Curated annotation (Swiss-Prot):
Cysteine pairings via disulfide bonds: C43-C108
SUPFAM superfamilies listed in its UniProt record: Immunoglobulin
Signal peptide: 1-20
Annotated segments matching region Framework-3: 77-108
Name the UniProt record assigns to this protein: Immunoglobulin kappa variable 3D-15
Domain Ig-like: 21-115
Keywords for the protein's UniProt record, in alphabetical order: Adaptive immunity, Cell membrane, Disulfide bond, Immunity, Immunoglobulin, Immunoglobulin domain, Membrane, Secreted, Signal
Domain of life: Eukaryota
Length: 115
């Protein structure tokens, strides 16, 4: 059995808008999981963003990669093990069967309100 690895998860990402800050809070900050396990990451908005929520994956030295948009729609080429759910203020990214290449930093971003 492979030793658990750290799946890094950004704790806080915020994007200001003209009506007030929307604060996106992600949890957990880090997640210790092993390949083959299920990983669940959560994102909470300080006010409703409807389904205007995206998830990104970033590996060292690489640009962020879009995984999910519209809260639950997989971007082109994203494996089916990645799924998104939620609306309003509560969102979840699930990796059903974690693979070694999935160990990365994950971000959520709202795009309901832009500056």
């Amino acid at each position: 059995m492979e030793a658990p690895a750290q799946l890094l998860f950004l704790l806080l990402l915020w994007l200001p808008d003209t009506t007030g800050e929307i604060v996106m809070t992600q949890s957990p900050a880090t997640l210790s999981v092993s390949p083959g396990e299920r990983a669940t990451l959560s994102c909470r908005a300080s006010q409703s963003v409807s389904s205007n929520l995206a998830w990104y994956q970033q590996k060292p030295g690489q640009a962020p990669r879009l995984l999910i948009y519209g809260a639950s729609i997989r971007a082109t080429g994203i494996p089916a093990r990645f799924s998104g759910s939620g609306s309003g203020t509560e969102f979840t990214l699930t990796i059903s069967i974690l693979q070694s290449e999935d160990f990365a930093v994950y971000y959520c971003q709202q795009y309901n309100n832009w500056p």
